Structure formats: structure tokens, C-alpha cells
Amino acid sequence: MAYLKAYGNKRVYPNTEPMTVNTIFDMASCSKSMSTAICTHILAERGKLRLLDPVSLYIPEFKSWVSEDGKDKKIIRIADLLTHTSGLPPYAPTSELEKQYGSPSPDGMIEYIANCRRDFKPQTDFQYSCLNYITLQRIIETVSGQSLRDFARENLFDVLGMAHTDYLPCKRDKDGKWINTADAHWATSTEGDWHSLIAPTEKQSDGSVLCGQVHDPLARVMNSGISGNAGVFSCAEDIAVL
């Protein structure tokens, strides 16, 4: 890295704290390209899957696109998920899924995606979709036998020396407040609370602020913070490695 400098504030509520060059951010949808897509290609490179494989090879209940008259049918491939040409909807109704399946429920999330409407015939259009990358997460975990967090850590983040990059598992406590259920990878090298390095994202209705718990609702509520569409936390220096 040729130049690294911090500007502005990393926090303005309940107190103001300045940004530092070591501040760690919720990478949100950048998680797709920073982790999920790369992990998929790592498995392809190792011969564990093929990008032209049908998704149903790894998720048997995953339905194909079928025309309204039932006369035309087309499978959805891993490549279609990666390139947002699968026809899957952009997002899913988090509150409805939570009511139906409970929280967290990665299996419920996949059941919904496997059977939800397909907006268009695969490979005929483009539509950015978080559901594509949540589906890729399930494929990665099925093929590797590891959680996305563990696979990315062992095969990507550690390999590149990204010491301050991680997924941060979370859940609601008994009072409904979001808390982390495991330490961040950088916790042992941080004096005091490892959350102190993280830039918070959003004030909650109870006055608390999300800090270390992914902001994306599907990733947080349904997938406990480890999700193919969002969930990576990282800093500028680590991102520069990628």
C-alpha cells in the first residue's frame, strides 16, 4: 500500500470517536466479492465443483425456472448465481421468514430460496440478488464440509495475511439486543474490547447501536451473521491485499 490515512469520525453516537487507519468496517455486500465468490472459485480450481454445475446437484430441492405455460424449463447453474443471471429475486422478506422458520434458520432460508419465484429465465437478464450469494454459501458449505466463516478463514483470509478480516457470529440476547457469540479473529491482538476497533452502523429502536453485528437483516436474523451475501468485517489495509 502506497498511502493510508484516516479522515472523519468512525462514531458519532453516543459519543464521537475519530476514524483511524485501523478501523474495521461492516463490509456489507462487498462480502460477496471479497469472500463468497472467491471461495466458490477456490473450490472450482480444486476440482470440487464446476461453475456450470446445476445448483440442484448440491441442493436437490432447488427448483429450475419453468415458463408460465409449463412448456419451457431451464436449470440454474452456479455460474448464474455468481453473475446475477439466475432470475432469483433481489431479496427476501426477513420478518416473514423469521415468523415462518424462526431465527436463526439457515435451513429455512435455503428452503425459501429453493422454492421462491424465478423472475426470469436464467441467462436472459441481469438482476442483482442477495439470494444468489446465500445459495452459493450453502454450496460452499456442502462441498467443503465447513462453515463459510471457517473455509474463508483457512483458505483465503489467513493465506493472504488478512489478520483483521472475519465473519462475526451474532444472536439476540434474552432482552432482544444483538450480541456476538464468538470472538473476532483479531481479539487476541487487541487490548481491551475487540469491538473498539469497529465502526458502528445503525442505532436500534432500543437506543443501542449495531457494532460488530452485521447490518444486513437476512444475514443477521436468518444466518446469525455468517452469510454469503453479507457479514465480512475488514479494514483498509486488509482490503488492499485483495
Residue ranges of each PLM-predicted region?
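Short, conserved catalytic-motif segment at the N-terminal edge
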Residues: 1-27, 48, 65, 111-115
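Active-site SXXK
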Residues: 26-52, 133-141, 239-242
